[in-house]
A protein has these predicted regions:
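Amphipathic alpha-helical packing segments from all-alpha helical-bundle domains
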Residues: 90, 101-102, 106, 110, ...
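Basic, helix-initiating cap at the start of DNA-binding domains
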Residues: 1-48, 56, 61-62
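Key DNA-contact positions within bacterial/archaeal DNA-binding proteins
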Residues: 51
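Hydrophobic/aromatic-rich alpha-helical bundle segments in the mid-to-C-terminal region
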Residues: 127, 149-199, 211-215
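Helical hydrophobic small-molecule/effector-binding pocket
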Residues: 69, 90-125, 170-176, 205, ...
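C-terminal alpha-helix
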Residues: 144, 198-210
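Amphipathic alpha-helical linker/stalk segments
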Residues: 65-95, 103, 107, 146-150
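Residues at secondary-structure transition points
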Residues: 8-12, 16, 58, 66, ...
Length: 215
């Protein structure tokens, strides 16, 4: 969770304090944006000293990366634990639904909007956001697809490419655009369930079981 788990001088850092800093920073990034969020403001919000922040994170960029990764890691375990049992459809539906609901959450959309609006640091922030969030989720999806392929449930010869395509089905949902002007509709459970069911059905149709593919 923290960047400097052993601290700058080899001493273990306080993990609970590090989490407090990350939580405060994430809220400020969402509220104020990257440029307006300073380490002084983070220290004030977290009720810690600025020195305490530097004991955990080398820079504001490192803190931003940790905040994005922490947010992602909070929902990812639940997303994939829900998909342990059941058919391929049930497992993928659990993952896809959790992913889309997370993408639709106000704070995630706010961070994305903040990154896109930050012309000064957009490139570097986009890289940090990708590494802390999407890249991690895609890796988890890849692992699930490898298992489904190994068990001959689905035919997934290229798990990396298929994981990226699966994630794109939800990242590319029109509900993310609709959320900008009609959030009630975009966040409606029936709308989300309908979209996810169709997306998963299409993905499974493109990755038929090995036995079917060789028949």
């Amino acid at each position: 969770m923290t960047q400097n788990s052993q601290g700058r001088r080899g001493r273990p850092t306080n993990e609970a304090l590090g989490q407090t800093i990350v939580d405060a920073a994430y809220k400020l990034f969402v509220e104020l944006g990257f440029q307006a969020t300073t380490l002084d403001k983070v220290a004030q919000r977290a009720k810690v000293s600025k020195l305490s922040i530097y004991r955990h994170f080398e820079s504001k960029e490192a803190l931003f990366s940790a905040a994005i990764a922490d947010r992602c890691h909070q929902f990812a375990p639940q997303m994939f634990s829900e998909s342990i049992d059941g058919s391929a459809e049930v497992q993928l539906l659990a993952v896809g639904s959790s992913l889309l609901r997370t993408l639709l959450s106000p704070d995630v959309r706010s961070v994305e909007a903040m990154v896109m609006a930050d012309k000064k640091s957009q490139k570097s922030l986009s890289k940090l956001q990708y590494e802390g969030g999407p890249a991690y989720v895609i890796a988890q999806i890849e692992a699930l697809l490898r298992q489904l392929h190994k068990n001959e449930v689905l035919d997934v010869p290229d798990p990396v490419a298929s994981a990226r395509l699966f994630a794109a089905l939800f990242k590319g949902s029109d509900l993310l655009i609709i959320a900008r002007f009609d959030p009630a509709r975009a966040e409606d459970s029936k709308e989300i369930d309908s979209y996810c069911t169709s997306a998963v059905a299409m993905f499974i149709a493109a990755h038929g079981a090995k036995s079917e593919a060789t028949a």
